[in-house]
Amino acid sequence: MRKFKQKAALTLTTAAMLAGSVFASSPANAASSPIAACGGGSYHVIDQHALSSYGTVYLMYNGSTDCVVTWKTAYVGTPTEVQAFVERESDFKAVVDDKKYSYYAGPVKIDAPGMCIIWGGSTALPSGATASAWYDYWSHCD
């Protein structure tokens, strides 16, 4: 009986750990702002676009590196699909973060001083349907 209880306790502990890993990703210490998500420092917001009432896509720059974060304003705390995207024109290198998050997607960063970029993001409803998406094509070229 004692071995059965030990095995049952181990099974429950393992199941609880696995269940925790199945839930959507969320930063251990969620950033307090889009700039903080990019790492703070010399990053500053150079553009932003509202995703209806579901979130805002922020483009930040520090003199050499572009950083994009999609910040949720609806279903905050609920894991939903959120995307942040940036692509460099010179070689079409793209960086994307597209997962279920509770607060924001990103940061996605790319070095592109003096180069055009595509940047944007999207949010989804809890059902998985796209709530809002927006992308700016070949902009911020200087």
State what each model feature region is.
Residues 1-44, 49:
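N-terminal prepro-regions of secreted/extracellular proteins
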Residues 30-142:
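Post-signal peptide N-terminal regions of Sec-secreted extracellular proteins
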